[in-house]
Amino acid sequence: MKISIAMASFNGEKFIKEQLDSFLSQTRLPDELVISDDGSTDSTLEIIKSFSQTCPFPIKVISNTQRLGITKNFENAMKSCTGDIIFLSDQDDVWLPEKISTLADVFNNNPKTGLVHCNAEIVNEDLASTGKTVWESTWFSHKEQQKIKNGKAFDVYLRHTVAAGMSMAVRADLLKTVLPIPDIFSIHDVWTALIIAAIADVTLIDQALLQYRVHGVNQTIGIHRLSLKEQFDIARKQACDNTFPNLTALHDNLVKRLEYLIKSGSYTIPVSVMNKAIKRHEHAHIRSSFSGNIIKKLAIMIPQIINGNYFRFSYGIKSIVKDLILR
């Protein structure tokens, strides 16, 4: 079984060497590393070139002549891989030595598994542990973990983004269902997880097999669980920034892609999965349509509360309060 790593890079000179070195420390080395660089203007490409001169496995570097953005840069790396299993990699983390071998064993032992993702330790920019994991900090509950173990990964992913790219590996022969990825900001991992969960099994590994580095540029996942005030401040910012167009576009594209896969006849997608995707799509559109008039909002929200969609596809009371007060 051939292992590929798909890495997206952009101005990563500060940390990329440590990430590359962590590939060398793997108990099971990759068979190739494919890096798509999105027009770095620092020394990133020089660091990669120096690393490649002594690296024991092949490295392919794609230098984009025009900036693609995060999503399409990852797609560029993924579609250029030739392995049977593709690991996604950021440019600023550190993989622990057993990461590749542990995830690869799952694919070897479970032919129906299409995607595997693991936990990660959160560290600061100097790699000092914060004592927290990504699953803790993103409120990935034991109930959700159990649902995935029971074959309900698609249900979880519709509501909660828990399959982060840096912790993920996918079976390459399923990439034709994933690509092309819609050109929406930073959705490569969410999209990949949703599509594969609709057509194949997903396996969780409750081990922190990499160090997720939190630093000034990358603050996607916080160091600690957020207080209610911090959550409120973030919700207010999201409401002001109006992030719903991206979410709505994601679910528009998800429904269209699943319909396409069904029509192609190549994959069996349960009717229940398709119905959930459609209902999630409708819920996203409803939430994106709110005006400032509280009476009009309530008239739209109450049916979504009664039918359970706020709890099935959003964050329950938190989302209700956000829509009622902040939007």
Predicted ranges, named:
Residues 100-106, 112-174:
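Flexible acidic/His/Gly-enriched loops in nucleotide-sugar-dependent glycosyltransferase catalytic domains
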Residues 64-81, 86, 102:
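Glycine-rich, basic loop-to-helix element that forms the pyrophosphate-binding segment
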Residues 157-158, 185-186, 202, 211-327:
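C-terminal subregions of glycosyltransferases and related glycan-biosynthesis enzymes
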Residues 2-3, 24-35, 43, 56-60:
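Short loop->beta transition adjacent to catalytic acidic/histidine clusters or analogous donor-positioning motifs
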Residues 37-46, 66:
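A conserved acidic beta->alpha catalytic loop
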